[in-house]
Each structure stands twice: as structure tokens, then as C-alpha cells.
């Protein structure tokens, strides 16, 4: 599994690298890792 770096796409807290959290994700829309 490849993780997303800061600023990368994510969905509901899934997909970010360690230490990052998903910001701005809404139902059906991807957020960005912060």
C-alpha cells in the first residue's frame, strides 16, 4: 500500500502517510493530507 505525502489525496482518514491526517474530506470527495 502506498501512502500519500503531505498535500496528497486521501479519503476519510485513509491513505495518508504516518503522522499525517486527512483534512477537508467530505462525503464522496477526497481531502488532502496535512
Curated annotation (Swiss-Prot):
Expressed by the venom gland. Keywords: Disulfide bond, Knottin, Secreted, Toxin. One of its GO terms (cellular component) is extracellular region. It is found in: Secreted. GO terms for molecular function: toxin activity. Its main location: secreted. Disulfide bonds join 3-17, 10-22, 16-33. Intracisternal injection paralyzes mice. The presence of a 'disulfide through disulfide knot' structurally defines this protein as a knottin. Belongs to the neurotoxin 14 (magi-1) family. 05 (ICK-7) subfamily. This is U4-theraphotoxin-Hs1a.
Amino acid at each position: 500500500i502506498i501512502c500519500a505525502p503531505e498535500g496528497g489525496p486521501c479519503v476519510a482518514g485513509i491513505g495518508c502517510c504516518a503522522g499525517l491526517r486527512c483534512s477537508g474530506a467530505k462525503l464522496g470527495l477526497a481531502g488532502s493530507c496535512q
